[in-house]
């Protein structure tokens, strides 16, 4: 994998930095594992904007990813690595010994021809999935479940990982990349290693149009709007003379946004500032 800086042949190419991976499959994806992906434009079923700055973008097929990894005791061969337009990580197409194919998130250093497996007592090596009760303390894992059998929810983006730092009773203690330390049931599954394509963070799109291809619309400052559109709008100059707020008048800059009190007991330490 190489990080390539483009030559400044035009203003749109001057600042572009690409991540080139020669190991990725150059053909079409595995069609039975594709499904339709409908664009919402950030609107809900009533047509109201629920997420700003979303709209347009290139058409995409969604790859059905196996986040549960529940085919225990059946070894799988890595047929190929593929690009996935719906996420920052690359995906790997597995061919199981019973003939079934599934997509998984491609861990770091996984290559075409490698073999992976899932189960209670599989080998401790990158790409294998097993319950966290059987993973050694200090190991680095990704694709972590929050509830047994629900499927992975933590550490799924490119280059992300979680470290197991303790085990007590039915729970293991994890340290997340954000600095948060939380407890999760030891029957939850995780995949050994970290997610590949860590160089994703080094890429530079270089122009506004590249954002639009990805379905991301411009973010307009509140001070550039009219008073009817934003609390910061209007007035002479750029000073809005009040505490920063959202377009709906809710305080920003440090206001707590977490409402899920049900799982507060699972968090041992809040995320720390970097």
Swiss-Prot record:
Keyword rRNA-binding: yes
Highest rank taxon of the organism: Bacteria
GO molecular function, one term: structural constituent of ribosome
Segments for region (Disordered): 221-274
InterPro entries noted in UniProt: NA-bd_OB-fold, Rib_uL2_dom2, Ribosomal_uL2, Ribosomal_uL2_bac/org-type, Ribosomal_uL2_C, Ribosomal_uL2_CS, Ribosomal_uL2_dom3, Ribosomal_uL2_RNA-bd_dom
UniProt keyword annotation of Cell membrane present: no
Role summary: One of the primary rRNA binding proteins. Required for association of the 30S and 50S subunits to form the 70S ribosome, for tRNA binding and peptide bond formation. It has been suggested to have peptidyltransferase activity; this is somewhat controversial. Makes several contacts with the 16S rRNA in the 70S ribosome.
Name of protein: Large ribosomal subunit protein uL2
Organism field: Hamiltonella defensa subsp. Acyrthosiphon pisum (strain 5AT)
Gene: rplB
